[in-house]
Amino acid sequence: MEVIVVIVVIVVVIAIVIVIDSNSNSNSNNSSDSSNESNNSDSSKNGGSDIYQFSSSNKPFLHNFSNNNPNYNINAYFRI
């Protein structure tokens, strides 16, 4: 019974951390929307190739495991 309680507590803590982190990421993205809109002309000069280039500060929590392969950007699947 105690083992089940410990597992439930761990799952709840992980879920809370993910929710808090996703909220902080969405807030930081909202604050940078105006700067992204002003840079649309720059992205069009580059052929729009910078759509999936995210700064390291905007990487979602627990999704930074793609460091072994720099050509594989997992963030492209989480931020459209």
Curated annotation (Swiss-Prot):
Leader sequence residues: 1-15
Keyword annotations for this protein?
A: Glycoprotein, Secreted, Signal
Q: Where is the composition biased (Low complexity)?
A: 23-44
Sites carrying sugar chains:
N29, N30, N36, N39, N64
Q: What is one GO cellular-component annotation here? A: extracellular region
Q: What is this protein called?
A: Putative uncharacterized protein DDB_G0286451
Q: Which organism is it from?
A: Dictyostelium discoideum (Social amoeba)
Localization per record: Secreted
Q: Where is this region: Disordered?
A: 23-52
